[in-house]
Structure formats: C-alpha cells, structure tokens
Design a protein with these regions (language model features):
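C-terminal accessory helical subdomains adjacent to catalytic cores in phosphodiester-
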Residues: 1-5, 16-46, 54-176
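MIDAS-like acidic motif and immediate structural context at the N-terminus
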Residues: 7-12
C-alpha cells in the first residue's frame, strides 16, 4: 500500500518557502521509502484561498488512487497562526480553518506565529522570506531545530504540531 501526503501550504508556487521547511523537517526527523510514500504540495498563494484549493486536492487524490486501489491519500493543511492571541480576526480564522479540516477529514498543522518564527526563531519580512528559506536549506539549519519546538500539543509561540501530525503515518514515516 502506498501513501500520498498532500500538503496544502500558504506560500505561492514560485517561492515554495513553506515547503522548504516542511520537506527539511520530514527528511531530518523521519525515515521513509520513496517508493511507498508520495509527497505532494498544493500552494494556496495566501491563507485566505484555502477553500479554492479543494479541486486541486481532489485531482491529486484521484490521480493517486487510479495508480492502485491500495493507495491512500491524506491531506494536511498548514497554516500560520499569525496574531491569534491579540487579533480576533486571526483567532476566528484559525477556528474556521480547524472546522474546515475536521469537516473534510484533513489534518491540521499550525505554525505559531508563522513558519519562519518556528524554524528561524524570528519574524521575517515578506521581502526576505525567500532568501531566508534558501539560507535555511543551504546551511542545513534544520539540524539546529529541536524536536520539542515541532511537537507542540497546543498553540504557543515559536511552536508547531507538525511532528505530532506526521507521527500518525507509521509505518510510512518512522522517526529517526
């Protein structure tokens, strides 16, 4: 049986910044066989476009299931928390996206307050996100990110739940 994990991320297809951090996380913390695990990405090009990506997600799902009736696809939406703790609009957005994921049987990964603060420990201005992600990958900075920072149980600053979510996919993903 093959497993496809479809990551739906906020970044756009050109920059791929979110995917750089997520893929480095998978490669750093998990063993997997590429023949049995397919990693796919859907780029939202902004978090507010999450509803418009269902068609693209469903296309990936159907393409993978056609290859073998034993193939399974799981969808993982990834969101920054932004100012959830001080801005009611951001808090409401998080609640709406969590409900959306639950209603569609999708996984929900959060980065608090954003993916850069989780992996780099600092806020990165929009114009520098691409260069910071490139530097992160080139310098293998994932090796300096602690598992505890990526294994959050509840939303808190500079944390994510990505490892908690990915741990559900044994035997396809096994912690190193």
């Amino acid at each position: 049986m093959g497993l496809q994990l479809v990551f739906v991320v906020e970044a756009n297809k050109k920059s791929k910044t979110d995917w750089i951090y997520i893929k480095d996380t998978i490669d750093r913390f998990y063993k997997y066989e590429a023949a049995h695990l397919k990693l796919s990405t859907v780029y939202m090009d902004g978090k507010n476009k999450y509803l418009s990506k269902k068609k693209e997600v469903n296309l990936l799902l159907s393409q993978y299931s056609v290859a073998s009736t034993n193939n399974v696809t799981k969808v993982i939406y990834c969101f920054d928390c932004d100012d959830y703790d001080s801005n009611p609009v951001d808090k409401e957005f998080l609640e709406k996206t969590q409900e959306f994921c639950k209603a569609n049987d999708y996984e929900y990964v959060w980065f608090c307050k954003d993916v850069e603060r989780v992996y780099l420990g600092k806020k990165v201005e929009d114009g520098h996100k691409n260069s910071e992600a490139t530097r992160f990958k080139a310098n293998k900075l994932i090796n300096g990110v602690s598992q505890s920072r990526l294994n959050g149980k509840s939303i808190s600053h500079n944390m994510s739940n990505i490892l908690s979510v990915l741990d559900k996919y044994k035997p396809h993903l096994v912690r190193k």
